[in-house]
A protein has these predicted regions:
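Thiol/disulfide oxidoreductase modules built on the thioredoxin-like
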Residues: 109-115, 123-166
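Short pre-active-site segment immediately N-terminal to redox-active cysteine/selenocysteine motifs
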Residues: 57-59, 63-67, 135
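Solvent-exposed coil/turn segments that connect beta secondary-structure elements
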Residues: 40, 66, 97-100, 122-124, ...
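C-type cytochrome heme c attachment motif
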Residues: 66-73, 138
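Structural microenvironment flanking redox-active thiols in thiol-disulfide oxidoreductases
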Residues: 72-113, 123-130
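Structural recognition of the beta-strand scaffold that forms the well-ordered cores
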Residues: 59-62, 91-95, 118-121
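N-terminal targeting signals for export/organelle localization
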Residues: 1-41, 150-152, 161-164, 171
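A short beta-strand-turn-helix
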Residues: 36-59
Length: 171
């Protein structure tokens, strides 16, 4: 019995010893993982290229799903911020974490909310895993050099107030 426990402990240690650095928790001030995916409309998207586009100063990367009720409120809030601060360099990109088979449902969800923000597809949750998304909605503020400036989870009034305050400091 003792040998089984030791063997399990060794296997767990070996397994977690080889977790790639790219999958480590993204910390404030660190460079965020780059990724390539497609948009909801089927266009190719590369984060590093997007960050370098003229006029882009701060990117909010928000992770959402259609089953997540607070995500709807968060998306409306972010659309309001995009309208308010877009001319100052704010860009908001939504990452749909649902299954690719649910793309039509995602489009309907966004139409129902009257949200017109660009949407990226998170195939097999690869982006969510790289960013260590543990709950929804989850927002990352990234500067044009690709560094994480702040992040938040949830959409309470206090979270939104602090989020907008931090955002204004970056713009």
């Amino acid at each position: 019995m003792g040998h089984v426990k030791i063997l399990i402990a060794i296997l767990v240690f070996i397994t977690y010893s080889f977790v790639p650095v790219a999958y480590a928790q993204v910390k404030i001030g660190q460079k965020v993982p780059d990724f390539v995916t497609t948009t909801l409309d089927g266009q190719k998207f590369a984060l590093k290229d997007y960050l370098k586009q003229p006029g882009n100063k701060v990117l909010i990367l928000t992770f959402f799903a259609t089953w997540c009720e607070p995500c709807g409120e968060d998306l409306k809030f972010l659309q309001k911020l995009q309208a308010q601060y877009g001319d100052q360099g704010l860009r908001v990109l939504c990452v749909f974490t649902g299954r690719i088979s649910k793309v039509k449902a995602a489009k309907k969800y966004l139409e129902k909310l009257d949200v017109n923000l660009p949407v990226l597809l998170d195939k097999r949750r690869a982006i969510s895993k790289r960013y260590k998304v543990t709950g929804l909605p989850c927002n990352y503020a990234i500067d044009r050099e690709g560094f994480l400036k702040f992040k938040c989870l949830g959409c309470s009034e206090e979270v939104k107030r602090k989020f907008e305050e931090n955002l204004r400091d970056l713009l």
